[in-house]
Curated annotation (Swiss-Prot):
Organism: Rattus norvegicus
Cytoplasmic side: 2-294
Signal peptide region: none
Residue span of region Disordered: 1-29
EC number in record: 1.14.14.18
InterPro entries reported for this sequence: Haem_Oase, Haem_Oase-like, Haem_Oase-like_multi-hlx, Haem_oxygenase_CS
UniProt-recorded name of the protein: Heme oxygenase 2
Membrane-crossing residue ranges in chain numbering: 295-315
Length: 315
C-alpha cells in the first residue's frame, strides 16, 4: 500500500493541499474589485501625482474654486444617479443600488444653495470637458448598463474613503462652518461605518454574475473615467496658456477699480514703485480669471476631478 494518503477520487492529499492556495489566489485575482484596483493603478498613480492634487492636499484651494468644484460635482452625480435609477433592476447593477446610503445629488443641492443662493440653477452650467464625461455616463446607462459598475465604484468608494479628509481640508482652508454648511457632499448620514460598508459593497460587486470579458470591460471603463478627468486637466492647461493674452485683451481696472494700487502687497514689494505701467499684479490676473465664465467652468471641473483623485488616494 502506498505511504501517501489518497482521496476517494484517487487524488493525492498532498497534491490537493499544494493546489489549494493557488486556487484561492486565482479566485482573488478574478474578483472584480481586485481587477479594478490593479487595472487602474497606473492611471491612478499618474493622476494623484499632479501638482494640482498635491496643492489641494496642502490646503491650497480658494473658495471660488471650491464653489465651482461643487458645481461640476453636481452635474456629474446628477447624470450618474439618473442612470443608476434607470438601471436599478438590471441584474448586472441591481446588487449595487444603494440610493439611501450613497446618492449625493440632494447633498450637493444643499451645498449649491449655500454657495450660490436660492437661484443657483440660473448661475451655473457644465464645462465642455465635464460635459463629455456626463455624456459618457448617459451613454453607458442607456446602452451598456453593466459598465455603470465602473463609475459607481470609482466615485462612491472613493468618496467614502477620502471624504472626511477632504471635508477637513476644505473646512480648514476655506474657513467653512464646522456644522457642515458647504460640505454636505462629504457627509454620508446613513453609513455608520465607512470601512465596513466598503467591504460589503466590494463583496456585492465580486458576487455579480459577470464573465471575465465583462469584468475586463468594466476595468477598461474605469480607466476611461480617469482619461475623461485627465482631459479636464488638459483643458485647464490650455486655459492657462491663453490666460495672459485674454487678460491683456479684455483689460480690467487695477483691483477692480477699488483702492490704491500702491497698497497692493505685490506692488509694494517691487523695487521700482514709481511706475505703475510696468507692474503685473497677480491679484489683477486672479480677478480676470474669476470673471471669465469659460475659465471658471474649466477650473470648476478641474477641482472636481481633484476631489475624486484624492478620494482614490485614501482608498
Amino acid at each position: 500500500m502506498s505511504s501517501e494518503v489518497e482521496t476517494s477520487e484517487g487524488v493525492d492529499e498532498s497534491e490537493n493541499n499544494s493546489t489549494a492556495p493557488e486556487k484561492e489566489n486565482h479566485t482573488k485575482m478574478a474578483d472584480l474589485s481586485e481587477l479594478l484596483k490593479e487595472g487602474t493603478k497606473e492611471a491612478h498613480d499618474r493622476a494623484e501625482n499632479t501638482q494640482f492634487v498635491k496643492d489641494f492636499l496642502k490646503g491650497n484651494i480658494k473658495k471660488e474654486l471650491f464653489k465651482l468644484a461643487t458645481t461640476a460635482l453636481y452635474f456629474t452625480y446628477s447624470a450618474l444617479e439618473e442612470e443608476m435609477d434607470r438601471n436599478k433592476d438590471h441584474p448586472a447593477f441591481a446588487p449595487l443600488y444603494f440610493p439611501t446610503e450613497l446618492h449625493r445629488k440632494e447633498a450637493l443641492i444643499k451645498d449649491m444653495e449655500y454657495f450660490f443662493g436660492e437661484n443657483w440653477e440660473e448661475q451655473v452650467k457644465c464645462s465642455e470637458a465635464a460635459q463629455k464625461y456626463v455624456d459618457r455616463i448617459h451613454y453607458v446607462g442607456q446602452n451598456e448598463p453593466e459598465l455603470l459598475v465602473a463609475h459607481a465604484y470609482t466615485r462612491y468608494m472613493g468618496d467614502l474613503s477620502g471624504g472626511q479628509v477632504l471635508k477637513k481640508v476644505a473646512q480648514r482652508a476655506l474657513k467653512l462652518p464646522s456644522t457642515g454648511e458647504g460640505t454636505q457632499f462629504y457627509l454620508f448620514e446613513h453609513v455608520d461605518n465607512a470601512q465596513q460598508f466598503k467591504q460589503f459593497y466590494r463583496a456585492r460587486m465580486n458576487a455579480l454574475d459577470l464573465s471575465m470579458k465583462t469584468k475586463e470591460r468594466i476595468v477598461e471603463e474605469a480607466n476611461k473615467a480617469f482619461e475623461y478627468n485627465m482631459q479636464i486637466f488638459s483643458e485647464l492647461d490650455q486655459a492657462g496658456s491663453m490666460l495672459t493674452k485674454e487678460t491683456l485683451e479684455d483689460g480690467l481696472p487695477v483691483h477692480d477699480g477699488k483702492g490704491d494700487v500702491r497698497k497692493c502687497p505685490f506692488y509694494a514689494a517691487q523695487p521700482d514703485k514709481g511706475t505703475l505701467g510696468g507692474s503685473n499684479c497677480p491679484f489683477r490676473t486672479a480677478m480676470a480669471v474669476l470673471r471669465k465664465p469659460s475659465l471658471q467652468l474649466i477650473l470648476a471641473a478641474s477641482v472636481a476631478l481633484v476631489a475624486g483623485l484624492l478620494a482614490w488616494y485614501y482608498m
